[in-house]
Amino acid sequence: MNQTQTNKNLFQPGDLALLIDRKERRYLITLAEDEIYHCHLGRLFLNDMIGSSIGSWYRTDKGHVLLAVRPTMGDFVRQMPRGPQIIYPKDLGNIVNFADIFPGATVIEGGLGSGALTSALLRAVGNTGKVINYEIDESVLPKAMRNIERVTPDTSNLEIKLGDIYQGITERDIDRVVLDVPEPWQAVSGIGDALVMGGILLSFVPTIIQVQRFVLALEKDGRFQMIESLETMLRTWHVTERSVRPDHRLSLIHI
């Protein structure tokens, strides 16, 4: 195994690490030399983790053990510092899939939020694609960019425009448009001008009334075909040797 391959399996300064305790509680940290992580389980000296293998166990000064792994994007999204309402991992996967975000695509995104959806889109378009984000609230940019850069350090293919997507889109021949805005029906006309023939528009909204208004606006515009409204449900299960039953929480998404 070469040195590059070896380093991929070792924690380095600046890496994100996910600590998991015996009760499967999770703690997201950034590794830094000569730093100490404090929690209710005790102190953990981060120098002990740097240079060691991912997937190792570490003991705090109180005797508690923690498993350290690389966080998935879903882990980071659940733990990320938040401003506006966040889109969770179950929704991100559906959005990328149903919008058919592909490597090399040029994607317009309406709304930046905490940066979770932007990060997922950047991953999906790859180095040869581009994400152009329209955000009206300048105050969300610093926190969102910190989140995005922790997941996708190379943001050279991300362009953020401080502007109102309801007022129109200047770009043309766009492959995909993904909206996470309160009133997506207000953006329909401008998106119709921007999308390439055969392009896809997807809007994520939390209520069925918003779905109805959006669909009616698409139909009235007349340039959009194959309009679909989707609701997906995600339920986790509690599985033991003695019983199998669904968990009590159920998650919904409207597209």
Sequence positions of predicted segments:
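N-terminal auxiliary segments of SAM/dcSAM-dependent transferases
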Residues: 1-67
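Conserved class I S-adenosyl-L-methionine
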Residues: 104-113
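Conserved SAM-binding motif I beta-strand of class I
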Residues: 130-135
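Conserved small/polar residues in nucleotide/adenosyl-binding loops
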Residues: 253-255
